[in-house]
Amino acid sequence: QTAYNWSYVHTHAIGRSSYKERYAAIYRTDRVQILSSYVWSDSGDRFEREPQIVKLRHKQTGEDYTFINWHTIFGSTSQRRAEIAEIRNVYQSIQNSDSSDQDVILLGDHNRDANSNYWDSLKSLGVSNRVNDLTSINSSCGYASRYDHFWFQSNHTNEYSSSGRDYISNLCTFRNGISDH
């Protein structure tokens, strides 16, 4: 429990196989207004789990941001490569849909290091990863991989500050409390 009021938006269970996931965005109601939240329409069935798109407004500044919340398939190399190539199209489509709102942020568990050449097509848009730390927590309760990312174009998202990161004192307790794997 905190001194602040929180709320969330979430998706239905998403996934092609019997394994399904839900995406969610949790936010402080005194700071953020949700403008929209939906699951990306994937008519070509290019994603194992379609991204969640959340558009929000920071109440104090009036700035709008659009988040693409997405968990890349872990499957084969070719499956991952195909999904990562397609997320570029999603990013560009969202950015092109509203010329007044270019603050698009792609985030999530992307099952691939940001330095991989898989990301070259996204990087060609001027998008860069802003978190390149070990973030995934392994079974021995240590940091394991650089799969969790925040991608955006710094020329459009100039409010970004890299000065903060939450550190958790007991990774085992945290991991076991929020993850099923």
Give residue spans per PLM region.
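Divalent cation-coordinating acidic motifs and surrounding scaffolds
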Residues: Q1-D180
